[in-house]
From Swiss-Prot:
GO terms for molecular function: ADP binding; ATP binding. It comes from Solanum bulbocastanum. This is Putative disease resistance protein RGA1. Disease resistance protein. Resistance proteins guard the plant against pathogens that contain an appropriate avirulence protein via a direct or indirect interaction with this avirulence protein. That triggers a defense system which restricts the pathogen growth. Residues 143-437 form the NB-ARC domain. InterPro entries: Apaf_helical (IPR042197), Leu-rich_rpt (IPR001611), Leu-rich_rpt_typical-subtyp (IPR003591), LRR_dom_sf (IPR032675), LRR_R13L1-DRL21 (IPR056789), LRR_R13L4/SHOC2-like (IPR055414), NB-ARC (IPR002182), P-loop_NTPase (IPR027417). Changing residue 149 to S: In susceptible haplotype. Induction: Constitutively expressed. Keywords: ATP-binding, Leucine-rich repeat, Nucleotide-binding, Plant defense, Repeat. Belongs to the disease resistance NB-LRR family. ATP binds at residues 182-189. The gene is RGA1. Changing residue 970 to S: In susceptible haplotype.
Length: 979
């Protein structure tokens, strides 16, 4: 990838030669010679890149060229940095250190020119041809919605595997394991995803777990990952034995479905250890695994491996067409003919067809397609398939501005879930992004990322809270890794990762160290990226200020750091400073505003009393996650006025703002690139200026996420309407007890999530307009602690809340649940019996979690009669509940039933239990007065799991073999009984 970085250095040289710095210190001729030398060498680089694959001397030549290029980049970078510093000093160009500086630069220039002359002379023996390289991808408009392409030709395979799962689940008496076997790029993972998401599998198995293995078959890591997947949250570090016990408790008696994707482990002992833990599941529990290795299939499989065949020529062609032409109606017949010849070379491998289709998507000249068809790369030695030549071709047909950005992704381990925004910051730090017109570098990086996605280099796109995450196929990752080999020189280490969580790997110019010491910084003066996150640091040494090339510094998660050295502010090239979750950090250096190149300052999770003074001087700043308003000049909202901020920002200590004119100084309405805004006051709610201040903080209409905390005004601002919040998808309002009414949320066309916490006693309806809005996009509604809330709408209609799926109501004693046809999940703390009766209005409900706060002794008989779709029911903290309604029997679809802390509950209804024919899990805990279990349990043939804890009377009656209730539960495979 030398050709890509040479272009970066050439662009820097060209830009530099046009500026005044080169004239002031007298190196114009030297830099001009460097530029000419690189231009001469660059002309033959495309040919060299293609030929190096089977020519070791040529590969070595490229490595030497790459090392020299990085050396030139260091010289240029240091020259610009120090020259700028001299000019900004009081002495200007007459600074006393200018002469030794010129001598040092001149000596280094002579040395690197000698190296480049030797490299240029050596190239002649390779007889390389000059070729024109495409510099940048074609300009086109792209949208923000990212979707995976249609899957072709695997429906038959999906149905066959689903049938195996279902049939085995019905017959098996032990854990079943089915390996899907096939070479890389055939679509084993895609097929497994289709099976995993099939409705038939979802209905028959619970829980469903997906784990990617790759090269690391570590039992502790895998068990931890499985537990985290089931519980949906991160797990603190634990020893293996308690991890094994926890997983067995979670899987005990469950007919689970586990996918182990991309397995390479050939050690039978490792698999045997994991299998022993997994065998606690119910009859029919199933493990589906994907692998390229027959030995892995024979070790793991209890069933005959499913060997995945190549795609048919027709399906391969459809996949290629979808990528190459999109939805274009008219297709050049000559391109179709050439395309079919290219597809033949793909050998029925989907990844090859998809990737080659991606690189040709915006090429419409026949010669461009012929160049791919006739490339000599097809004739190179192949290992397991035709996939690697196809992937190499995809790289060689990338424009220059994409190549190095793609190859850099090799520093992440396989199957890493990468954040697009972070990756773009890394690209910027290494100088891979070229300026383009008036676009910000972040926008250029976004274009590059979209180009690589459209060419199928990235996959598995997810968007969470406004951030985009993605992965790379393991073969695409292998390609990036192989191309990184030219950067293995130890003389140009530019990135160090010293964290403990395996987030990045050591490759090329990136080095991972197991621990950090201050002396480490003195060894690597060319560093662009220094990652010390979660390194348990107490302090950062002042020598950090000597890393003049440093662009990216990550100190996040170092909760012991209380302050940062003043010399940090000497890092004139620093672009990203990541300090999030440095819990003890209370202040930043006063001279932080001198970090003139800073673009990303991440401060969420710190304990700052105020943001550093005069932060508005950081005119390059694009991401400022947190702004803490101070009391003194230079710490106030006006510092945000001229900053073109991107992403999200949380503004706190708004109670310190006394005038709406001060709030207007923030100029939020002009910040079109902010997608998330959080505004917070101290929670005492006694701020007389809050209403005027919030009105003055009107955001831009591009905003998507809005949160307001501790607002003390009596009404929310007029700008909370359709015109300003037309793109908002999520609103959260907490601690606004003085607001007597709510804005017209129902008119917001894109609002998907609405959370209201602790509201005024004057609020009776979420929307009390005579003509209320429809809430056309709302899917999630959470309301806490509204003492007089009676309903959602004062005037209900037929078309309101058409897609609402999830509702949560806590501490709303007057609330009556309306009739809503789409709601599937309800969580409610019952504060009035009326709420219990109104639950029956939600006929589509599949999950119900109710807790009591009214001392109810019984539940309404009609409560369950209309809930025919209910699958999960949890009843907790009904301290005085003595009996359950017989209408429980109408819940024919119920799979899971749980009772917790129902102290007075004496029995479960005999007739009610008999009707629960689909029940697979019953859990009763802390029901101290429960006297016995119903006889009807014997007839629940689907019941596989029974858990009884802290129920002393029943516990004794369930003693194995001799207890009075033992015969009622003896047929249940998995029992958990604790006194």
């Amino acid at each position: 990838m030398a050709e890509a970085f040479i272009q970066v250095v050439l662009d820097n040289l060209t830009s530099f030669l046009k500026g005044e710095l080169v004239l002031l210190f007298g190196f114009q001729d030297e830099f001009q010679r460097l530029s000419s030398m690189f231009s001469t060498i660059q002309a033959v680089l495309e040919d060299a890149q293609e030929k190096q694959l089977n020519d070791k001397p040529l590969e070595n030549w490229l490595q030497k060229l790459n090392a020299a290029t990085y050396e030139v980049d260091d010289i240029l970078d240091e020259y610009k940095t120090k020259a700028t510093r001299f000019l900004q000093s009081e002495y200007g160009r007459y600074h006393p250190k200018v002469i030794p500086f010129r001598h040092k630069v001149g000596k280094r220039m002579d040395q690197v020119m000698k190296k480049l002359n030797a490299i240029a002379e050596e190239r002649k023996k390779f007889h390389l041809q000059e070729k024109i390289i495409e510099r940048q991808a074609a300009t086109r408009e792209t949208g923000s919605v990212l979707t995976e392409p249609q899957v072709y030709g695997r429906d038959k395979e999906k149905d066959e595997i689903v049938k195996i799962l279902i049939n085995t689940a019905s017959d098996a008496q032990k854990l079943s394991v089915l390996p899907i076997l096939g070479m890389g790029g055939l679509g084993k993972t895609t097929l497994s995803q289709m099976v995993f998401n099939d409705q038939r599998v979802t209905e028959r198995f619970y829980p469903k777990i997906w784990i990617c293995i790759s090269d690391d078959f570590n039992e502790k890591r895998l068990i931890k990952a499985i537990v985290e997947s089931i519980e949906g949250k991160s797990l603190s570090d634990m020893d293996l034995a308690p991890l094994q016990k926890k997983l067995q408790e979670l899987l005990n008696g469950k007919r689970y479905f586990l996918v182990l994707d991309d397995v390479w482990n050939e050690d039978q002992h490792k698999w045997a250890n994991l299998r022993a833990v997994l065998k606690v599941g119910a009859s029919g529990a199933f493990v589906l695994t994907t692998t390229r290795l027959e030995k892995v299939g024979s070790i793991m499989g209890t069933l005959q491996p499913y060997e995945l065949s190549n795609l048919s020529p027709e399906d391969c062609w459809f996949l290629f067409m979808q990528r190459a032409f999109g939805h274009q109606e008219e297709i050049n017949p000559n391109l179709m003919a050439i395309g079919k010849e290219i597809v033949k070379k793909c050998g029925g491998v989907p990844l090859a067809a998809k990737t080659l289709g991606g690189i040709l998507r915006f090429k419409r000249e026949e010669r461009e397609w012929e160049h791919v068809r006739d490339s000599p790369i097809w004739n190179l030695p192949q290992d397991e398939s035709s996939i690697l030549p196809a992937l190499r071709l995809s790289y060689h047909h990338l424009p220059l501005d994409l190549r190095q950005c793609f190859v850099y992704c090799a520093v992440f381990p396989k199957d890493t879930k990468m954040a697009k925004e972070n990756l773009i910051a890394f690209w910027m730090a290494h100088g891979f992004l070229l300026s383009k017109g008036n676009l910000e570098l972040e926008d250029v990086g976004n274009e590059v990322w979209n180009e690589l996605y459209l060419r199928s280099f990235f996959q598995e796109i997810e968007v969470e809270s406004g951030k985009t995450y993605f992965k790379m196929h393991d073969l695409i990752h292998d390609l990036a890794t192989s191309l990184f080999s030219a950067n293995t020189s130890s003389s140009n280490i530019r990135e160090i990762n010293a964290n403990y969580d395996g987030y990045m790997m050591s490759i090329g110019f990136a080095e991972v160290v197991s621990s950090y010491s201050p002396s480490l910084l003195q060894k690597f003066v060319s560093l662009r990226v220094l990652n010390l996150r979660n390194s348990n640091l107490n302090q950062l040494p002042s020598s950090i200020g000597d890393l003049v090339h440093l662009r990216y510094l990550d100190l996040s998660g170092n909760f012991r750091i209380r302050n940062l050295p003043k010399r940090l502010c000497k890092l004139q090239n620093l672009q990203t400073l990541d300090l999030h979750y440095c819990d003890s950090l209370s202040c930043l250096p006063k001279q932080t505003s001198k970090l003139g190149s800073l673009r990303n300052l991440l401060l969420d999770g710190c304990s700052l009393t105020s943001t550093p003074p005069r932060i508005g001087l950081l005119t390059c700043l694009k991401s400022l996650s947190c702004f803490v308003i101070g009391k003194r000049k230079g710490h106030q909202l006006g510092e945000l006025k001229n900053l073109n901020l991107y992403g999200s920002i949380s503004i706190t200590k708004l109670d310190r703002v006394k005038k709406d004119t001060d709030a207007k100084e923030a100029n939020l309405s002009a910040k079109a690139n902010l997608h998330s805004l959080c505004l917070s006051w101290d929670l005492d709610g006694k701020h007389r200026y809050d209403s005027e201040v919030l009105e003055a903080l009107k955001p831009h209409s591009n905003l998507k996420y809005l949160e307001i905390n501790g607002f003390g005004g009596i009404r929310l601002p007029d700008w909370m309407n359709q015109s300003v919040l037309k793109n908002v998808v999520s609103i959260r309002i907490r601690g606004c007890e003085n607001c007597s009414c709510l804005p017209p949320f129902g008119e917001l066309p894109c609002l998907e999530s609405l959370e209201l916490h602790t509201g005024s006693a004057d609020v009776e309806y979420v929307e009390d307009n005579v003509h209320p809005g429809r809430f056309p996009s709302l899917r999630k509604l959470v309301i806490w602690d509204f003492s007089n809330l009676k309903g959602l709408l004062k005037m209900e209609g037929e078309k309101q809340f058409p897609v609402l799926e999830e509702m949560t109501f806590y501490w709303c004693p007057m609330f009556v649940i309306p009739t809503l046809s789409s709601v599937k999940t309800l969580k409610v703390i019952v504060t009035d019996a009326t709420v219990l009766r109104s639950i029956s209005n939600l006929r589509a409900l599949t999950s119900l979690d109710i807790s009591d706060n009214v001392e109810a002794t019984s539940l309404p008989e009609e409560m369950f009669k209309s809930l025919a779709n209910l699958k999960y029911l949890k009843i907790s903290f009904f301290r005085n509940l003595k009996e359950l309604p017989t209408s429980l029997a109408s819940l024919n679809a119920l799979k899971s039933l749980k009772f917790e802390f129902c102290d007075a509950l004496e029995s479960l209804p005999e007739e009610g239990v008999k009707g629960l024919t689909s029940l697979t899990e019953l859990s009763v805990s802390n029901c101290m007065m429960l006297k016995c279990l119903p006889e009807g349990l014997q007839h629940l043939t689907a019941l596989t799991t029974l858990t009884i804890t802290q129920c002393p009377i029943v516990f004794k009656r369930c003693e194995r073999g001799i207890g009075e209730d033992w015969h009622k539960i003896a047929h249940i495979p998995y029992l958990t009984l604790y006194e």
